Amino acid sequence: MGFVKVVKNKQYFKRYQVKFKRRREGKTDYYARKRLVVQDKNKYNTPKYRLIVRLSNKDVTCQVAYSRIEGDHIVCAAYSHELPRYGVKVGLTNYAAAYSTGLLLARRLLQRLGLDTLYTGTTDVTGDEYNVEPVDNGPGAFRCYLDVGLARTTTGRRVFGAMKGAVDGGLNVPHSIKRFPGYDAESKKFNAEVHRAHIFGLHVAEYMRSLEQDDEDSFKRQFSKYIKLGVTADAIEAIYKKAHEAIRADPSHKKKELKKDSVKQKRWNKRKLTLAERKNRIKQKKASFIKRLQAQAEA
């Protein structure tokens, strides 16, 4: 059969069905979403939880959510911009920061559910494979599935760093070691030391040292924030170790305090008057009008 040209007449447009809005905008992969959202029919009203990881230029977002007809419900969330509270003040979008954000999400969620003492995860971070074991005579481990959105799932991606942090924090996320840094596809072998180096930011420290020796100007430009805050290559591992301990000690969310002496915002339009102010304004207008009438009568 040869090529048949589509005739875009009245009948064509009457029957035309547009794709979903988020598909048209290129924001949602509905092929993947369907498989992440649809629950087994024998589990009835049990939600299917997703570990959502999204990366931006300045932040790493980790959320646990489940789907309903009216929309997704967020159970818990953690962001890399919270890490300065735990001692990590720079490099909030690298692999180590993604791991820390995933760890923060896991500990925060389990604390809310009252499972933080039963499922502590692993405190010995070796970079090797770890899976949460369910406890006997108790509630099972919290199970969720990784949702990477439109991100490419290549080996060494930061989304898998966030997932590893969540798993080490005590969540049950089905995964394999094939996408972690240190896995060689040709030899099919996994080097856990390479993965551990990424978790503690040692790859950043190594690059800092090499760049400082090769090109000092580039080093000062690329690592200006590190230099400003006095973060050296030798101190990076200790910073992340302390951050992991601090996250486990207190993963709860802290509300941002408003600054007392903050700058007063400019207002470009008039503020609406209250009822009392409107009544007072009318009263003044009446008094002024009566006074003017009296002055005219006397004249």
From Swiss-Prot:
Keywords: Cytoplasm, Nucleus, Ribonucleoprotein, Ribosomal protein, RNA-binding, rRNA-binding. InterPro entries: Rbsml_uL18_euk (IPR005485), Ribosomal_uL18_C_euk (IPR025607). Its main location: cytoplasm. PANTHER family: LARGE RIBOSOMAL SUBUNIT PROTEIN UL18, RIBOSOMAL PROTEIN L5-RELATED. Component of the ribosome, a large ribonucleoprotein complex responsible for the synthesis of proteins in the cell. The small ribosomal subunit (SSU) binds messenger RNAs (mRNAs) and translates the encoded message by selecting cognate aminoacyl-transfer RNA (tRNA) molecules. The large subunit (LSU) contains the ribosomal catalytic site termed the peptidyl transferase center (PTC), which catalyzes the formation of peptide bonds, thereby polymerizing the amino acids delivered by tRNAs into a polypeptide chain. Component of the large ribosomal subunit (LSU). This is Large ribosomal subunit protein uL18. It comes from Bombyx mori (Silk moth). The lineage of its organism: Eukaryota, Metazoa, Ecdysozoa, Arthropoda, Hexapoda.
